[in-house]
């Protein structure tokens, strides 16, 4: 099973909402705690914000957006061997039991928010009184004879949210190839 799942849902107007998918309990049974938070990082992807309507005269603005985190903190797994950098739009962190493992972490200059999210790209603030550290982002494991991977970002491979590289898709293709053979 390959999960693309949010701990916190972000709608098209950049308004965060509680995730309503009802899969938190199932993930716990698999040994993965999907946290109800959002990970931010100083290692942020450049994102274009602004007018998407051609009739508007405002030009889009491209800026680093802390809620779209870039990382190359990977476990030594074959599914990551040809991947150089991954981008996670509005990702939550995961905690794993001993039976599960962490495939990908955020960069060490990262932190989490659990409430009072301000997703506006114009008001990205540096963390204050927050410990920066790497946070687990992708978990994998087995359950019985089955295998699973949890990617805590439902937009991880959606067209409008892909990074400038194909590495997000490359990871997914590698995972599918490994888990179906």
Tell me what each language-model feature is.
Residues 1-180:
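Acidic, S/T/G-rich, low-cysteine, solvent-exposed domains in lumenal/extracellular/periplasmic regions
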């Amino acid at each position: 099973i390959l999960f693309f799942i949010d701990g916190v849902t972000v709608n098209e107007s950049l308004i965060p909402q509680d995730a309503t998918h009802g899969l938190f309990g199932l993930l716990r049974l698999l040994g993965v705690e999907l946290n109800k938070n959002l990970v931010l990082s100083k290692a942020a992807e450049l994102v274009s914000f602004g007018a998407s309507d051609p009739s508007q005269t405002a030009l889009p603005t491209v800026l680093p957006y802390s809620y779209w985190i870039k990382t190359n903190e990977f476990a030594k797994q074959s599914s990551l061997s040809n991947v150089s950098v991954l981008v996670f739009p509005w990702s939550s962190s995961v905690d794993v039991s001993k039976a599960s493992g962490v495939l990908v972490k955020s960069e060490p200059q990262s932190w989490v928010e659990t409430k009072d999210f301000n997703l506006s790209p114009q008001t990205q603030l540096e963390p204050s009184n927050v410990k920066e550290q790497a946070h687990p982002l992708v978990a994998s494991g087995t359950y019985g004879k089955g295998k699973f991977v949890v990617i805590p970002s439902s937009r991880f491979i959606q067209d409008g949210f892909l990074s400038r590289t194909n590495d997000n898709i490359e990871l997914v293709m590698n995972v599918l190839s490994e888990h179906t053979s």
